[in-house]
Amino acid sequence: MSTEKLTVALLSGGASAEREVSLKSGEQVFNALDKQRYLVLRYDPAHDLTRLAADAEKIDVALIILHGRMGEDGTIQGLLESLGIPYQGSGVLGSAVAMNKILSKQLYIHAGLPVAPHLVADRREPPDLDTVADRLGLPVVVKPEHEGSSIGLSIVRNRDQLAAAVETGWQYDRRCLIEKYVHGIEITGGVLGNDHLQALPLIEIIPGEAYEFFDYKAKYTPGASREICPARLSDTITAKAQEYARKAHQALCCKGYSRTDMIVSGNDIFILETNTIPGMTATSLFPQAAAVAGISFSALLDRLIELALED
């Protein structure tokens, strides 16, 4: 290991549907890393894995700034472990579990966390969609089992839209989640730490008028949505949501940091999903919450590296 600067492998790009987001995040992370403290080597897993393996012995720690398949799903985490390279965030298990929306729901329920009513549509055994609509009511949200950034997601308000939405989900995965649409305030709660989890200020998300929900474009287009931090919630709801973010992190075996999306409906909070590698672009939520907590972007990266090296 280096006796002066830490050698950091910065991984961004990859081959998932979220490649462009990853590249933007990676560029901002590279610019924010303190070059007085770190020697930063950049790798795109889409074509640099052989070089990464060859460089493994000189790498002190990796920053995984990848999203979606082969980034957040435990694949790259397993490779880094086989190479003996520490990395920030969740391990193989936590990454794989959080990436799977259906399994995540089961673990949330097991942990006593509230989720919206939902059903699973399996392409091998297609459900009767009229029965689905009767059981859940409309509107519903249809999501592929594994994709992130709302890729493949549809909101269905009429029965005649349901079949097409499920077919869209099946383009990405054999199974998709059909979830009751909950009207309310969309919030997200980040946590930071290993043994001691620091709950960051909650962010309230208000998609712009052109966006029905916080979808891919709303997330990554500057000015497409408003984010209010801290969220405009009562102290009681705030404390409950922050505790839910901690519990969701633990229920999915996450590590280091995560961000859990939730809906506040009246006095109720419903867990949507947990992100194990939150975005790191100018419009990203986790860095915004950290900044409100007094943690600059550069200091956040320092902290993630420290947490990666704790084990």
UniProtKB/Swiss-Prot annotation:
It is found in: Cytoplasm. Mg(2+) 1 binds at residues 261, 273. It holds the Pfam family Dala_Dala_lig_N. The keyword Nucleotidyltransferase does not apply. The keyword Ubl conjugation does not apply. Pathway: Cell wall biogenesis; peptidoglycan biosynthesis. Its EC number is 6.3.2.4. Its cofactor is Mg(2+); Mn(2+). Residues 105-306 form the ATP-grasp domain. NCBIfam families: D_ala_D_alaTIGR, PRK01372.1, PRK01966.1-4. This is D-alanine--D-alanine ligase. The lineage of its organism: Bacteria, Pseudomonadati, Thermodesulfobacteriota, Syntrophobacteria, Syntrophobacterales.
